[in-house]
Amino acid sequence: GGSVDGSGGSSEAADAVVKTIIDNGGKAISNGASVTDDKGVANMVEQTLSEFGRIDVLVNNAGVLRDKSFSNMSMSDFEFVVDVHLMGTVKTTHAVFPIMKEQNYGRIVVTTSSSGLYGNFGQSNYGAGKMGVVGMMNTLELEGAKYNIHVNALAPVAWTRMTEDLMPPEAEALLTP
């Protein structure tokens, strides 16, 4: 049993998940703040603490794509993707890490990607952001150990709104639960 705060730039999907959780007897809230906005992240953390009293788990899973080959990519697209994936993870983690230290407990999950670990044509921005979170995860695992804070990374693959245009249609049947 746990409680869920679904946060992100688009509240519709999060609100649907919140409704499902509540309809099944759970507790959940949503927050449409962007992980790139310092004030929005602070408000998200305050809302979560106000509703649930503590933060035990943080899952960093915000994501966007702006795919183009590196020589054709604008710097604004590169920076935007890195800002969401890497700096969004940094900002949310930085906001909850002191809370978890004080609680002497915390679990942080960051999502990475095979694009960060191995590269993928047209995803230099995405790959840079996703590899950056791996470096941060490795360091925070060491720094958090004495406070019972565990930090891990997952490199999932799924059929989502973000990936549906990247995969062949037959992949949907294999990746939809």
Functional labels for PLM-detected ranges:
Residues 113:
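Residue(s) in the substrate-gating loop at a strand-loop-helix junction
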Residues 24-27, 47-60, 66-69, 105, ...:
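A glycine-rich helix->loop->beta "capping" turn
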Residues 11, 32-46, 75:
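The beta1-alpha1 cofactor-binding region of Rossmann-like NAD(H)/NADP(H)-dependent oxidoreductases
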Residues 69-70, 74-79:
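Substrate-binding pocket helix/loop in short-chain dehydrogenase/reductase
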Residues 93-94, 138:
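A short, exposed helix-loop element centered on a Lys and neighboring polar residues
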Residues 118, 139-149:
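Active-site-adjacent segment of SDR/Rossmann-fold oxidoreductases
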Residues 116-119, 124-132:
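The catalytic Tyr-X3-Lys active-site helix of short-chain dehydrogenase/reductase
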